[in-house]
């Protein structure tokens, strides 16, 4: 190895793309991977200072901490054709995972009819969503220490196994167990897709593919109920799960044969034995985190709807969840850098800003994605399938705008301007949607949906890019997991808030406008049955009540979208083009 002279080094600027390494005569590095303060000095092996001004265009100390670590995609090049095949497989995987969240919406009645399981049907959805949310941070820890390719293939196999169990389920219990297994695999599969993209692609190309993966959520939200209804009516509901098998199989083959990542997250391998490796995964923290999240999500789902907020079941959830949460926080403070949720990451303004931004913007999307179809079904009197079609302006515009903005980020390098625009446009679109009334025409709901979709497209997928850009390579899995977890948590929390606003408004509105109509009966029947249950003479008044209740729920989306700006403001202006950390050395 040829090392540069001290005189030359002293005059050479150091930045995040050019990290200089001083070597001792025995070819051992004298400058280890350490944090170098901006404008500071480094010393050579003899102790004499080498006056080298650090000029980091991004002023991000995390990059400097691991200057000696190369990005995976620079270590193991992969051809463009293989990248295309792998990305196609990852898109299929994320689509399957997203589809499983929505496809049962129209198929559940057939399942309940076959298994005679009216009291258990809520678990067909909850078993999947609970495990999907509860294991996301745990997989972030696993991906930190073990190869992304291997972990991804294992979680994909789990998802496929869960889907197979669901499809072949002989009874309701087997279906619920299969859904839980699929949820565990799904969350690891989604996180692995994001990480594999960051590993096999140059980082300035990552935003486009991340946007494509994020678009699968929106597409699945529309396609899922249509497919579920078609399978249930014309084939069998079991195909709602069997459909995952061929698509997942293709993804497995593509990743297995074409991804050869050189980054094996070596820290776990440094441990001397299996016990040490296991302890590196923060098992105590994970064991406390999972019941914390399950208790929280169950409380949000059951509270006020299934059970009273003062029932003993909810009280048990409060106590157990609270105790586990306190224990988890204590373990994270104790373990620090080896924690599932390292405290130092939460002190990084790019991370807590991204968390706030993601939580608020994703929350607004969830509210409108859920309540817009209800508005179409109840106010316009259309079927569930027709309401999905009428929801297309929002989804299509969001996908197109997301891909367009990600392309611009690839060209310009900076994502921050789009994160500023997203809350402004999205809150405006949501605000206009909240002004809709019973007689609003198609030009109104199409235009307002499109405006809201533009706002979502500007920022929804770029939040993951923001976290990955701001972190050094070894922290990217944890940072990505935090954002993915925030997306799931936002869905649960904002659905709960909007549901309470909607239900309270319906109850108070019906008591005044149509006291003879049973709110409980309407809620149980669903929005598509509104015109069959309500007498013709009171229908106009009930429609006004429903319109008011739904648009009040839209207020939640307006407020959450507007609050997202407070997450965008703290973010540094970092360029994805500078996300490349290499040691500058010469080889003889």
Curated annotation (Swiss-Prot):
Residues 1-10 have a biased composition (Basic and acidic residues). It is a multi-pass membrane protein. Residues 1-28 are annotated as: Disordered. Keywords: Membrane, Transmembrane, Transmembrane helix, Transport. The keyword Hydrolase does not apply. It comes from the Eukaryota. InterPro entries: MFS (IPR011701), MFS_dom (IPR020846), MFS_trans_sf (IPR036259). One of its GO terms (molecular function) is transmembrane transporter activity. It is found in: Membrane. The keyword Membrane applies. MFS-type transporter; part of the gene cluster A that mediates the biosynthesis of the fungal meroterpenoid acetoxydehydroaustin. This is MFS-type transporter ausY.
């Amino acid at each position: 190895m040829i090392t540069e002279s001290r005189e030359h080094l002293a005059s050479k600027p150091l930045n995040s793309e050019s990290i200089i390494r001083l070597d001792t005569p025995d070819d051992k590095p004298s400058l280890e991977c350490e944090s170098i303060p901006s404008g500071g000095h480094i010393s050579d092996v003899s102790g004499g200072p080498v006056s080298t001004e650090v000029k980091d265009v991004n002023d991000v100390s995390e990059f400097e901490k691991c200057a000696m670590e190369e990005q995976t995609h620079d270590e193991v090049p992969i051809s463009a054709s293989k990248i295309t095949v792998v990305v196609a497989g990852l898109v299929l995987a994320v689509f399957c995972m997203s589809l499983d969240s929505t496809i049962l919406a129209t198929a559940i009645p057939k399942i309940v009819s076959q298994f005679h399981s009216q009291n258990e049907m809520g678990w067909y959805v909850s078993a999947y969503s609970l495990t999907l949310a509860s294991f996301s941070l745990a997989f972030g820890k696993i991906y930190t220490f073990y190869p992304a390719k291997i972990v991804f293939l294992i979680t994909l196999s789990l998802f496929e196994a869960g889907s197979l169990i669901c499809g072949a389920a002989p009874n309701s219990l087997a279906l619920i167990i299969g859904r839980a297994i699929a949820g565990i695999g799904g969350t690891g599969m989604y996180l692995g897709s994001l990480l594999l993209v960051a590993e096999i692609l140059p980082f300035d190309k990552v935003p486009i593919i991340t946007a494509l993966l994020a678009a699968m959520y929106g597409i699945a939200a529309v396609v899922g109920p249509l497919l579920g209804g078609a399978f249930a009516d014309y084939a069998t509901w079991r195909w709602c799960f069997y459909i995952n098998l061929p698509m997942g199989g293709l993804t497995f083959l593509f990743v297995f044969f074409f991804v050869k990542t050189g980054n094996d997250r070596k820290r776990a391998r440094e441990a001397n034995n299996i016990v040490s490796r296991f302890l590196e995964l923060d098992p105590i923290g994970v064991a406390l985190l999972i019941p914390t999240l399950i208790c929280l999500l169950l409380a949000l789902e059951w509270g006020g709807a299934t059970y009273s907020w003062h029932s003993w079941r909810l009280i048990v959830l409060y106590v157990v969840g609270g105790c586990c949460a306190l224990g988890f926080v204590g373990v994270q403070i104790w373990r620090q850098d080896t924690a599932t949720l390292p405290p130092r990451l939460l002190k990084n303004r790019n991370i807590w800003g991204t968390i706030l931004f993601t939580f608020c913007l994703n929350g607004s999307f969830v509210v409108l994605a859920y309540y817009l179809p209800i508005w179409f079904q109840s106010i316009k009197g259309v079927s569930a399938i027709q309401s999905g079609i009428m929801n297309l302006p929002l989804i299509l515009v969001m996908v197109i705008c997301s891909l367009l903005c990600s392309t611009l980020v690839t060209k310009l390098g900076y994502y921050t301007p789009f994160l500023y625009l997203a809350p402004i446009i999205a809150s405006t679109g949501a605000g206009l949607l909240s002004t809709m009334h019973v007689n609003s025409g198609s030009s109104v709901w199409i235009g307002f949906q499109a405006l809201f979709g533009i706002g979502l497209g500007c920022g929804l997928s770029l939040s993951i890019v923001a976290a990955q850009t701001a972190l050094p390579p070894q922290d990217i899995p944890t940072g990505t997991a935090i954002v993915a977890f925030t997306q799931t948590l936002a869905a649960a929390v904002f659905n709960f808030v909007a549901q309470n606003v909607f239900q309270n408004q319906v109850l108070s509105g019906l008591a005044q406008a149509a006291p003879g109509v049973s709110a409980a009966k309407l809620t149980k029947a669903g929005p598509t049955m509104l015109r069959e249950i309500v007498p013709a003479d009171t229908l106009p008044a009930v429609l006004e009540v429903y319109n008011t209740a739904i648009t009040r729920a839209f207020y939640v989306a307006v407020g959450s979208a507007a609050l997202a700006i407070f997450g965008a403001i703290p973010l540094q202006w970092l360029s994805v083009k500078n996300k490349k950390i290499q040691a500058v050395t010469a080889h003889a």
